[in-house]
């Protein structure tokens, strides 16, 4: 490990690896560090991604694709089921990944592009001089180091310290954190070509239960509930109840517990010499909590802007503002619209959800026009259409794609 690089990336998740790969391909000297000894472990999500956007970053590989999903089922509290094709199911439906292999494949691509990758290497602080980030202090195998750089990219996840060290407000209110629990189960006995989403305030207050196929009759089965709506029952207890009632033959072989920020965007994600990407920048989707593709998209933008700034010889916040502007115009717009949807739906009663599902149950979501969708929503819930009016204006203008591309 050298004492100076052009770019240091903190965190080797999807966002960090794409940032490192992009910067290295631009000819920059890049160091990417990961605090854990194994990249991709532990798993923090349901592992679903949309096909179109994934292919913008990496060619799909059977080694890390567990399931090729053709659609999703949304199940209302009374059991009414809506089927949606993959193209209409959102940014987390398409492929179900094996994250442990996928994350390492991305890190390997960054290394092949020229980045230096160091595991079991923990950032302990930033080096800040004249109000500018100029490197990091780190711990590697029990030894302390100071490594300087022209730009630091913080991709250190939900618990990010990098942004906080730089004076960026990244704290999230408990009410804006989705508390999650997930099992990997065998003997799942579900259709391995579909993802399942169960809605209802009894099974998941202000949230949902998901089932993502993993191949070989296995599935990720998880729950996410909004912190502000969590009652006496903990997510793990609600999940246990769901599995007992709906998957009595399932066998638990792995468990993950964590939290996902669903707060929408934070005020800023840059400082002099610094950019934040992924969960560190609160770029996850407020509805689903999914953030793999958003992190990768943001990482690519950050890597490109890092190269531009370094070539220009100016890594100030004014130059890095281009990163802020670019991700907010794309990723940020989708996040803001998802936040409107989330804030609308968390106030729905089970009766509201049942009514909506009943009105949409026979719709073919692969061929429906926007106008017919609006008519169906209006029939189901007139207030809903009014609450979401701003989003539909953007869709009609073609400014939002919601990651529904095939």
UniProtKB/Swiss-Prot annotation:
SUPFAM superfamilies cross-referenced by the UniProt entry: FAD/NAD(P)-binding domain
Coiled coil among keywords: no
Domain of life: Archaea
Pathway(s) it belongs to: Membrane lipid metabolism; glycerophospholipid metabolism
Catalyzed reactions: a 2,3-bis-O-phytanyl-sn-glycerol 1-phospholipid + 8 oxidized 2[4Fe-4S]-[ferredoxin] = a 2,3-bis-O-(geranylgeranyl)-sn-glycerol 1-phospholipid + 8 reduced 2[4Fe-4S]-[ferredoxin] + 16 H(+); 2,3-bis-O-(phytanyl)-sn-glycerol 1-phosphate + 8 oxidized 2[4Fe-4S]-[ferredoxin] = 2,3-bis-O-(geranylgeranyl)-sn-glycerol 1-phosphate + 8 reduced 2[4Fe-4S]-[ferredoxin] + 16 H(+); a 2,3-bis-O-phytanyl-sn-glycerol 1-phospholipid + 8 A = a 2,3-bis-O-(geranylgeranyl)-sn-glycerol 1-phospholipid + 8 AH2; CDP-2,3-bis-O-(geranylgeranyl)-sn-glycerol + 8 AH2 = CDP-2,3-bis-O-(phytanyl)-sn-glycerol + 8 A
Entry's cofactor comment: Binds 1 FAD per subunit.
Pfam families xref list: FAD_oxidored (PF12831), GGR_cat (PF22578)
Xref: InterPro entries: DGGGPL_reductase, FAD/NAD-bd_sf, Geranylgeranyl_Rdtase_fam, Geranylgeranyl_reductase, GGR_cat
One function term, GO molecular function aspect: flavin adenine dinucleotide binding
Cellular-component GO terms for this entry: membrane
Keyword Mitochondrion: no
Function: Is involved in the reduction of 2,3-digeranylgeranylglycerophospholipids (unsaturated archaeols) into 2,3-diphytanylglycerophospholipids (saturated archaeols) in the biosynthesis of archaeal membrane lipids. Catalyzes the formation of archaetidic acid (2,3-di-O-phytanyl-sn-glyceryl phosphate) from 2,3-di-O-geranylgeranylglyceryl phosphate (DGGGP) via the hydrogenation of each double bond of the isoprenoid chains.
Family named by the database record: Belongs to the geranylgeranyl reductase family. DGGGPL reductase subfamily.
Protein name in UniProt: Digeranylgeranylglycerophospholipid reductase 2
Biological source species: Methanococcoides burtonii (strain DSM 6242 / NBRC 107633 / OCM 468 / ACE-M)
Organism placement in taxonomy: Archaea, Methanobacteriati, Methanobacteriota, Stenosarchaea group, Methanomicrobia
